[in-house]
Each structure stands twice: as structure tokens, then as C-alpha cells.
């Protein structure tokens, strides 16, 4: 994000991001599997067929998000400082660490600021409620989240690493924070 963009972890911004992801998910050419809204940036884990599809899809997503977030904040102009940063996930361990980072980065920063969050509480500014890989969360709650959301902001993973491969290194726990 550009300097001067207001703090993004607000309910209105989260709803806008989820709405954009829900509407755009079938049109982007990429599949957003996990996301989180941070204070001044967004995290996504996506599946794409190739680099050109990834570039086109994320460019389209950035445009849609910028228009929607700017509209919500009552501002105009460029929102994102630069293009996205990407990394191809290559191993089950790296994939598990990345999922943990994206879904649990908000609570990690809250803890660093001295904020108290309930044990095992999910980050409401992420796609954690749609995540099926928690060892300590009832799978029926996840299925209920999928069924009760007409246009979910994320897609179910299709590639082996994001769907099952990462589980070889152990399911996540809701209170498991990213490494410092």
C-alpha cells in the first residue's frame, strides 16, 4: 500500500475485500485459496496455471480491490505501492508455514502489541473460518461457513500441496502463531 492509506483492519474494509473476492473468484483466472487483511497490506495464497495467468489474475484483482477500497475510504487514485510479491511453494513444510503465516499473522501482531485475544480465536480478517486443516476445530463449523456464504471469498484448494500435501507435516492448531 502507498503511504497515507488508512489502517485496513476495519470491518468495512474486510467486508469489501470479501465481497470483491467472492464476485471476482470465477473471473480472475487465479484461485484465491487463503487471504488475510493486515494493517497496511493484504496476503493471498493463490493457485494459477502459469506465470502469465498469475500476473493477469492478480492485476485484475488489484484493480478491483483498489476501486472498492478507495470507494469505501472516500479516496481516489493509486492504492498499491508496487506490484505483488510472489513465491512458488515447493514443499509440504513450506506450504504449511505459508498457510500458518497468512491465516495467523494478524493475531501474532496483536500479541506483539499486547492485545489479548481469546485462546484459539480465529482471525476474522482472514479466511481462517473456511480453513479445513485445523486439528482443534470442529470440521462441521467449517462446512457451515462454506454453506452459509453465498459467494465465499476463497476457493477450495485443488493443487496437491494446498489440498493435502502440506498435511504431511501436521495439521495446524488455532493458537499456532507464525515464527518471529
Regions found by a protein language model. Give the residues of each.
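Short Pro-Cys-Gly-centered "Cys-loop" motif that presents a nucleophilic cysteine in a tight turn
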Residues: 5-40, 47-180
